[in-house]
Regions:
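Active-site beta-loop-alpha junctions enriched in small/polar residues
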Residues: 9-13, 38, 65-67, 95-99, ...
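N-terminal start-of-chain detector that recognizes signal peptides
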Residues: 21, 33-34, 63-64, 99-100, ...
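Aromatic/His-enriched, Gly/Pro-containing loop or helix-boundary segments
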Residues: 70-71
């Protein structure tokens, strides 16, 4: 016997439509509802926050937040808030990002594949430590962070899901 689960991937739609479609997916028996992240679309975490308020059971996930375009500490704060709001139903899909998805419009963004992969690795390390609310210094190749105990008092609480929010990353 397997524990196979089924999720639905939503098209790029508004936050209100994400909430409506996730509610419909839950009502029709789906196990998960996933929202993409593209440069020109609404932020998936906003849509999933709306969905967290209209659903009770279905898992809510991103596919796939390109970490080279985000600061890991901001993603940590946002995902911790969404994990609490959804009562532990968040799956955080993150990746290095697909350069063909509009990055050419932003000449300051990192397009080198190796550098983007390094940024993803560093982001995973930082996210994991922030989810544990550790005091730490991080001096990576791409990200630098000095987190004191005083800083931690303002950072969101640990995630509902332990030991951390599930992090999914694609492989191509």
């Amino acid at each position: 016997m397997t524990n196979l689960k089924f999720g639905v991937a939503l098209p790029y739609v508004s936050a209100r439509e994400v909430a409506e479609l996730c509610t419909l997916a839950e009502e029709t028996g789906w196990d998960g509802c996933f929202v993409g992240d593209a440069i020109w679309c609404e932020d998936p975490l906003i849509g999933l926050a709306a969905a967290a308020m209209t659903t009770q059971r279905i898992r809510l996930g991103t596919m796939i937040i390109p970490m080279p375009l985000r600061k890991p500490w901001k993603v940590a704060s946002e995902s911790l808030a969404l994990d609490r709001l959804s009562e532990g139903r968040l799956i955080l899909g993150i990746g290095a990002g697909a350069v063909w998805m509009g990055w050419q419009c932003f000449p300051d963004e990192v397009t080198d594949t190796k550098a983007r992969a390094e940024m993803l690795d560093e982001s995973i390390d930082i996210l994991t430590r922030l989810y544990r609310r550790e005091q730490f210094d991080y001096d990576g190749k791409h990200f630098h962070l000095k987190l004191t105990q005083m800083d931690l008092q303002y950072f969101p609480p640990k995630p509902v899901q332990q030991p951390r929010i599930p992090l999914w990353t694609p492989g191509l």
